[in-house]
């Protein structure tokens, strides 16, 4: 089932320097909660500056949903320590609040209680909040409080030069983008390995179902927790953060222009369902527009091709201008065993898997084939640890045992690991392979199995509160390592100043400004 990558691996072993200079970045979302686990109702902490303009600390959907962002980094330890400093400083500034250590929220009874993230009075800030109002009215606020980790990854120019002979200009843009699209297609085919290993949301609180009927064979504990005994990541299931109305958009990952055309089509295609919500009611705006996507960011995807945007530029226009610059992996649950929601083992695994995905052959995929890849993901998400589970290839009928496919993949990853270790010295990447490959013979080692044991004993709420309390105490005690307190204060003040400047520069009323941007 695994494509034959032996030639590409042999090439890599002859050109190890092609992997020198991989760049990465991390984003981590987490809810601010009170000591009893309920959602914090306070505004974004003043000590953290302006969520609109802060470089490292912002908010996602809700005012209480923090998001930490590391700068682009070539050094794994440095990146993780930077992320830890953001958590250390924030933990000290949250008073009695703490950061929820799980992807799935628990003590939120009704979506209406969730305050949308606020970004001030500028047109840009109000637009961001209106976009969130639209998300709430379309999908419900509860779904939007699910949190995850995003891993951003780019290969060095040396890789593309060695692999495709490119230097710069239009030809380089096309070839590099084609290489990243190959990575993305392989991710759709084989990325289910991520929830298998690292999924950590095998259970949900009953409030999440909100009385909606479900066909899933949930088991229920006395404290109202619903779980599937072999599930890995309900966050990635239809109960979690997905968007069924987007499954037939026909967006494909074969070609830059085709992909962008699909995205642009979706933001212009009217939706009957969203038109029923209305765009405005009693003088209050309910969504930016009633199209299938209000803006491009609404496209739900487990992985995204990206380029840093210039001022006023849409993500797709940035891609057209310069091609794909990096990849954003969006399938990681919060790692509940790490105070910062992600750890070194995961980052090293993702490095290996990304390199494998870019090396392995990946025939072009129609939108139908793309939908077929969802079958494997759904199996792993809902019953990934089930004995005897099999997976298929795309829309074909042949089936293969998951443990065998996983071990075959890791045979390749081990060779990539040897190459990466040869550049960096040590055996860190190979060690990660040895640790993780054991999860295929023993699913009890996976994150989902480990956290489910705790959840069955303590409930989701009890588990979240215990871990959250322990991490709060730990982070508050640890000294900062990379950033100094003065740098946090300087960025707080600078971010507030930047927000004020944006607000002062606005001359156009919001309604007129929105008419141009909606």
UniProtKB/Swiss-Prot annotation:
Pathway(s): Sulfur metabolism; glutathione biosynthesis; glutathione from L-cysteine and L-glutamate: step 1/2
Entry's EC annotation: 6.3.2.2
UniProt KW Ligase keyword: yes
Pfam families linked: Glu_cys_ligase
Entry's Gene Ontology cellular component terms: cytosol
Any single GO BP term: glutathione biosynthetic process
InterPro entries attached to this UniProt entry: Gln_synth/guanido_kin_cat_dom (IPR014746), Glu_cys_ligase (IPR007370), Glut_cys_ligase (IPR006334)
Catalytic activity: L-cysteine + L-glutamate + ATP = gamma-L-glutamyl-L-cysteine + ADP + phosphate + H(+)
Keywords: ATP-binding, Glutathione biosynthesis, Ligase, Nucleotide-binding
GO molecular function, one term: glutamate-cysteine ligase activity
Family from the record: Belongs to the glutamate--cysteine ligase type 1 family. Type 1 subfamily.
HAMAP family tied to this protein: Glu_cys_ligase
PANTHER family to which the protein is assigned, alphabetical: GLUTAMATE--CYSTEINE LIGASE
Stated name of the protein: Glutamate--cysteine ligase
Species per Swiss-Prot/TrEMBL record: Salmonella typhimurium (strain LT2 / SGSC1412 / ATCC 700720)
Gene: gshA
